[in-house]
Amino acid sequence: MVKPSLEFALNEPNRYYDRHFERSAVKILPGEYFATRENTMIVTVLGSCVAVCLYDPVLKIGGMNHFLLPNDNVTAPNMMTESARYGVFAMELLINHVLKLGARRNALEAKVFGGGNVLRGLTVQNIGERNAEFVLDYLQMEQIPVIAADLLDIYPRKVYFFPETGLVKVRKIKTIHNSTIMDRESEYRLRIKNLPSGGDVELFGE
């Protein structure tokens, strides 16, 4: 008998034990996602990127992604642009894998974070705002209610998501001692800049 999957991730999960919260955790980086049906905390650090914490509050299944839209020189996101199609692909990956773990499509709830104006030297004005606008528009289009949001501002955020309860804790990082956050997002942005769109990903049913 095949055991049901307990989690899905884009890459090998970066696992660690969080001493403060006294629990197992997975840290995701720009371009990654993680979905689980276990009591695993999901953690990420956001600058201009956005993260969606998606979960089924009854079945206690959830996941988080971390992405931004590639630069296609469009001021506002539009679902037909190449960059928006990349965002759609990032969202559909997360939704599909939460559903594969057993979550119900019509029970999903979302909490969204990030979109800060923290990157320097970008040709697109306020990329964080574009990312935030895209993710809110997408969730509205998919009829997934946004239960909580902490978007925009000028500070990076560290996000802690507890999928079994839907609880999210956010810490604004107002003092930055190095350029790690900006370097990771800049490298990720350059990596996806010339990628073809993700293509069509069929969503599972209710």
Swiss-Prot record:
One example of a Gene Ontology biological process annotation: chemotaxis
Molecular-function GO terms, alphabetical: protein-glutamine glutaminase activity
Keywords: Chemotaxis, Hydrolase
Domain of life: Bacteria
InterPro entries: CheD-like_sf, Chemorcpt_Glu_NH3ase_CheD, Cytotoxic_necrot_fac-like_cat
Alphabetical list of Pfam families matching this protein: CheD
Reactions it catalyzes: L-glutaminyl-[protein] + H2O = L-glutamyl-[protein] + NH4(+)
E.C. numbers: 3.5.1.44
PANTHER family: CHEMORECEPTOR GLUTAMINE DEAMIDASE CHED-RELATED
Family designation: Belongs to the CheD family.
NCBIfam families in the record: PRK13487.1 (NF010013)
Chain's role: Probably deamidates glutamine residues to glutamate on methyl-accepting chemotaxis receptors (MCPs), playing an important role in chemotaxis.
Name of the protein described by the UniProt record: Probable chemoreceptor glutamine deamidase CheD 1
Organism for this UniProt entry: Shewanella oneidensis (strain ATCC 700550 / JCM 31522 / CIP 106686 / LMG 19005 / NCIMB 14063 / MR-1)
